[in-house]
Structures are given as C-alpha cells and as structure tokens.
Amino acid sequence: IIPITIAAFAAYAFAFMEFRGKEPLFLLVVASMIIPLQMSLIPLVQLFKSGVEVFGLPIIPALDINGAFVATWFAHSGFGLPLATFLLRDFMMSLPRSVIESAKIDGASNMTTFFKLVLPLSVAGIAAFATFQFLWVYNDFLVANVFLGVYKPENLVVTSHVSQLAVGAYGEAWHLRTSGAIISMIVPLTVFFSLQRFFIRGLIGGAVKG
C-alpha cells in the first residue's frame, strides 16, 4: 500500500506535470532499480539502528527499529517504490492526453484531475503492480529474515516456520512440511485470481479510448 500510494502521485507528476529537473529525477528513479537489493541491506540495517550523521550533525535520527515490523515496511516500500513509479508512469502516459487537457481547460486542478480522471483510469495498472508487490513481499525471505529473524526469532517468516515443522522419529516429517507449504499458497492464489482481470489489463498497458 505504501509504495503504491506514493508512486501513484509521483507517476502523475512525471507523466503530466512540468517542473525543473523532471527528466534527471526520473532517470535517478530508473537508475535506482539497477542497484542490487543485497547491496543495500547492510546500509539499511545501520541506518535503522544508528541513523545518519554528517560532520557530527544528525541528519536522520537513530530509530532503532531493527527487529520490528516497521523496518520491513520501510525496506519493502523503498525497494518497490522505483519499480512502481516507473510502471505507473508508463501506464499513465498511455492514457489519452485529450481527456487530461480538457480537464485543465475546464479549470480542474492537478489534485482534481488525479483523483477524478487519472486514478480511475489507472485502476488496472495499480492492481497489476499491487499483485506483483504482494506476491514479492509474501514470498520474500531475505529482507524479512534480515530485519526480523536475526533480532527476534519469534518473528520468522512463513518460509522459515514451514522448514522448521516437527521432525519425525526417524527423520523429517515431510507430510507436515508439504501440507504447510500448500496451505501457505492459499493466500497468494486467492489474491492473484481475485485481481486477475485487472492484472491482465494492466500488463497490456492501458488501451483506453477517449
């Protein structure tokens, strides 16, 4: 929810608004998608623990949120925000500009245009990315394990709990593991099939006729 909300506003700004530094800023967003997730884990752990200081001046205060769920929220939001902005911006660019220009001629503000026109027309693209984001976060092991499992073992992700199910008398209780794995698939399958209609529409890129 967090990256989708922020990215929707950012995508509208990149698609329909003119401001200084627009192109370099968008290139920075695209370039941030190239950074491997693994390279940013240690800096994020340090950031969440000690904050950031420049010449002894605290720029970002020490939050000390490692081991809390809010750390994974920030991490997943930060990793998903560039891709969300990129995809939604391309989707909004495919919308008919005549509709947007007509709204501006009629005196509609950017907020009115966004909420009344662009947002309803972008439901398919938002739902498509929401499906991607949910499946990634639900299946994620590395980020959740780094920010939760290392500090509080009781906060282990579903994958770890499934792998640690009861051990039988003569070895691993594979029947429990397979049952747990199948049960853990119910939630993502439910989300995917409920959003399948929007997911397919979002992938083909918003063919909207004005």
Predicted regions and their residues:
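A structural signal for multi-pass alpha-helical bundles of membrane permease subunits
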Residues: 1-210
